[in-house]
Amino acid sequence: LVDFPCFTLSSMLKKTFYSVAVEDTRYVFNGIYLKSTDNKITAVGTDGRRLAKLEREVPNKLPFTKGVIVPHKAIREILKLIESASDGKIGLIENQIYVSVNENALQCKLIDGAYPDYESVIPKESKYKVKLSKDAVQTALRQALIAAEEPIKQIRLTFETNLLRVNSSNPGSTEFSVSIPVAYDGEHLTMAFKGDYLNDVIKSVDDQEILMEFSSSGAPAVFRDPSDVNYTAVIMPMKL
């Protein structure tokens, strides 16, 4: 068993958990992937349409050099266990993850299977980079989601010169549109996203600004936290 700082693991799990699938037939998507190298640990969550990845340095080398997939139900229990503690112990026992804090311990079966090549999903370069105000986007999203059609709740982001338009509609009833000033001088471009996916990624960023990167309306959009260079989120846009 290896000592680990509870706050580090807790924050990593929270910032990637929202991207995990719940009952996907592709079982590897139903958990968070943990992989350690030297004194670093990487946590990844994906459901095949979005992805969240976070890296952190840890004082001790953790036993996940081959990579493990921890089920979402186990993640919930681990978070409860480590939430208010400072340090704990973690290890692998056969095909199970073991976590202990003080007198309490938890042992959970891991998900079998090969995790997808998540690095290949993250664009290496993007044509456009735009800084967004977290508050402005959250406010616009909150309103747009009310008007968006269930169950997909599609939100359209249209980038124009120095302007971002946030649109949603529900055929036959409501339509919503709001404009947010942004520093953008690229081509006129519209992207569509599942509203809840956008909302989740905006909430996951701690900074008051969000860096959004994209190359075209059909290419994956990357979201970064300016205050945390080790955090990356990706959302696949919907077809317009």
Give the positions of each predicted feature:
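Structural preference for solvent-exposed beta-strand-turn elements
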Residues: L1-L240
